[in-house]
Structures are given as C-alpha cells and as structure tokens.
C-alpha cells in the first residue's frame, strides 16, 4: 500500500493499513510529518478532534506520527510522488521526485490541498532564509527578536499572537483595513500588545547579511515609516496545486479528487481521503479525514485480496490484531 501524503488523514491511514496487516510506504514532499498541521499551524489549538478537548497542532501531528509508526511503515519524507505506471496485474509503479521507484498494489492519496507554496513577498526576496521566512514551525527560534508579520488572514493573525509570547516586539501590517481572519482571533489580536498597521505594505527591505529594517507604506496616504526588525514573517497565503497527481488519470473537480462512497477514485485501486477527496456533502474536518482514511484502507484491502473481509474487527479485540505482515 502506498499512501501519498503524511498529513493527519495519511498518518491515520498508515496506522490503519498496518492494523490490516498491509506493508505500507508513506510519501510526502515535506520533510516533517503532519502536513499543514505541522507546517502552518504548529502552535494553533485544535478543539474539534473527538475525545481531545484541546491540543496544539504540533502535538496532534506528533501523536498521529507515533500511532502511524505502530506497524513500522516505510516513511519517505522529502520525496514527492511523480509519475504513475499501471502494470498488467493491476498494481502500480510510482516514481518519486527524488528518483525512487515504488511498487504498490493499491494507493491512497491523502495529499491535503496538494503541493502548496507560499505567495512570495514582492520585495526583499533575496533575504529569504536570512530574516525573511514564510513558516514558523518553532516559535522559540524567534525568541527575543523584533518581528514583522505581513498578512491579514488566519495564518498572519495566528503567527502574530503566537510570537507575541516569545518575541521582543511584534508588528502586524495588512494592506487592507479589514482582516480576513476569524473574528474571534482578530478581537484577541486587538486586545494584545501586537502593534497593528493598516492599510500598510512592505515597500523596501534593508540589511547586510540579515534583515535589519523595512519601509512600510500607507496605502491611502503614501506615508512611509521605517521599522527596525530582525525577522519578517510573510503570511500572504498559499498557491496550491495537485502537481504530478493531476496527470494520474483520476476524475478531478476544482483541484480535488472525486471519490465514491468507498473513497475509490475513477482509477481502480486508487483511493483518496482527507481534504483532497471530494463528494456531495463533503465537510473538511480532521475527524472526517480519519473516517475516510479507514474506509479507503478497508476497501483497498478487499480490492487487493477479495478473500479479506471489509470489516476487520475492532482494534480493542486482541485476537483481531495482525501478527504477521
């Protein structure tokens, strides 16, 4: 079984496929497990996972990874899925962006929103990695620094609130008067010590080896203010695309993969689960992705070996646990 994507749905699918005594390979172009959860929202509190009143994104990602490793899947992080070749027996050969070749009897695509790349700050791109960043996986790296956050969506506001706890100072600029972020988060922002500048944009970036200052320009008055900063966190949104997956022959709908009630795609033995899967009434929640992953794995198991039962029993029943793989 090949699982493409190591986000929440993919990690749970890896666990469940192991529970069903399948050999599992997990691919993800990101170098850390957890998908968007770990890359974009590590310090965001998640409240809507059943049985867990509240948990940080990075903690949930770590727990899912630990659970996924129960049956020792092969975890190939930093390797993106590339070309797909179907063999005469119905199985597949998949090449990776790093040159690996994987043989799979079935595939589950749990690629979230696909390959996502941050929208670049229009100025100062030469400082990327030297004071300009687009992700904050570890806020402690910015402890004691003067931070400028750029953006008006949920990520920007979340980053500003997260970094307020550790930074020397945080300034948030947005090119519009109104924020796109969740109303409750914006209220929390306005009650915080974060300095808010709207409607401002970064017009110039200064520095030597690293960023030292920026000019920000008021969109309405054209007033320019220079800010001394140590780090710029640009949270301007992301451009998402399916990448090579779009060429695999699956029916697509608005960059999502169309599935039926078994999570099967239009290509036999390829399934999809999580945010990338689309069907009438779809709701994009982590908890929904878990259920879709289990449905996909169980149906894939039967597609590979029709003698297997669709429902394998409960994990709490000791004699239902697989002893051989």
Swiss-Prot record:
Molecular function terms in GO for this entry?
Answer: ferredoxin-NADP+ reductase activity; flavin adenine dinucleotide binding; NADP binding
Which InterPro entries does the protein's record reference? FAD/NAD-bd_sf, FAD/NAD-binding_dom, Fd--NADP_Rdtase_type_2, Ferredoxin-NADP_redctase_2
Catalysed reaction(s)?
Answer: 2 reduced [2Fe-2S]-[ferredoxin] + NADP(+) + H(+) = 2 oxidized [2Fe-2S]-[ferredoxin] + NADPH
Cofactor(s) needed for function: FAD
Keyword Flavoprotein assigned to the entry: answer is yes
Give one Pfam family.
Pyr_redox_2
- Residues reported to bind FAD: 28, 36, 41, 81, 116, 275, 316
Task: Give the source's domain of life in one word.
Answer: Bacteria
Explain how, and how many, cofactor molecules are bound.
Binds 1 FAD per subunit.
**Per the UniProt record, which EC number(s) apply here?**
1.18.1.2
Q: Which UniProt keywords apply?
A: FAD, Flavoprotein, NADP, Oxidoreductase
Provide the assembly information. Answer: Homodimer.
Q: Which family does it belong to?
A: Belongs to the ferredoxin--NADP reductase type 2 family.
- Name of the protein: Ferredoxin--NADP reductase
Query: Which organism is the protein's source?
Result: Acidothermus cellulolyticus (strain ATCC 43068 / DSM 8971 / 11B)
* Taxonomic lineage: Bacteria, Bacillati, Actinomycetota, Actinomycetes, Acidothermales
């Amino acid at each position: 079984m090949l699982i493409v994507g190591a986000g929440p749905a993919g990690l749970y699918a890896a666990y469940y496929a192991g529970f069903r005594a399948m050999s599992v390979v997990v691919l993800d172009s990101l170098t850390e497990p957890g998908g968007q959860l770990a890359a974009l929202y590590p310090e965001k509190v998640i409240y809507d996972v059943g049985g867990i009143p509240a948990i940080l994104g990075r903690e949930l990602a770590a727990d899912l990874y630990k659970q996924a490793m129960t049956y020792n899947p092969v975890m190939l992080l930093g390797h993106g899925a590339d070309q797909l070749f179907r063999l005469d027996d119905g199985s597949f050969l998949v090449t990776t962006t790093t040159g690996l070749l994987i043989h799979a009897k079935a595939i589950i695509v749990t690629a979230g929103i696909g390959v996502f790349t941050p929208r670049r700050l229009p100025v100062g791109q030469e400082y990327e990695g030297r004071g300009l960043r687009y992700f904050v996986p570890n806020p402690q790296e910015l402890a004691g620094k003067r931070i400028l956050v750029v953006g008006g969506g949920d990520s920007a506001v979340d980053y500003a609130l997260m970094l307020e706890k550790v930074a020397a100072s945080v300034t948030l600029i947005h090119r519009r008067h109104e924020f796109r972020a969740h109303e409750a988060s914006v209220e929390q922002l306005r009650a915080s010590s974060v300095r808010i500048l709207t409607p401002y944009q970064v017009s110039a970036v200064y520095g030597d080896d690293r960023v030292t200052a920026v000019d920000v320009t008021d969109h309405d008055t054209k007033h320019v203010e220079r800010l001394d900063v140590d780090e710029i966190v640009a949270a301007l949104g992301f451009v998402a695309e399916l990448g090579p997956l779009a060429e695999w022959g699956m029916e697509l709908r608005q960059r999502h993969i169309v599935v039926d009630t078994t999570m099967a795609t239009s290509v036999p033995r390829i399934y999809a689960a999580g945010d990338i899967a689309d069907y009438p009434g779809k709701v994009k929640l982590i908890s929904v992705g878990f259920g879709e992953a289990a449905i996909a794995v169980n149906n894939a198991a039967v597609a590979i070996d029709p003698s297997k039962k669709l429902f394998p029993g409960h994990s709490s029943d000791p004699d239902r646990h697989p002893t051989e793989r």
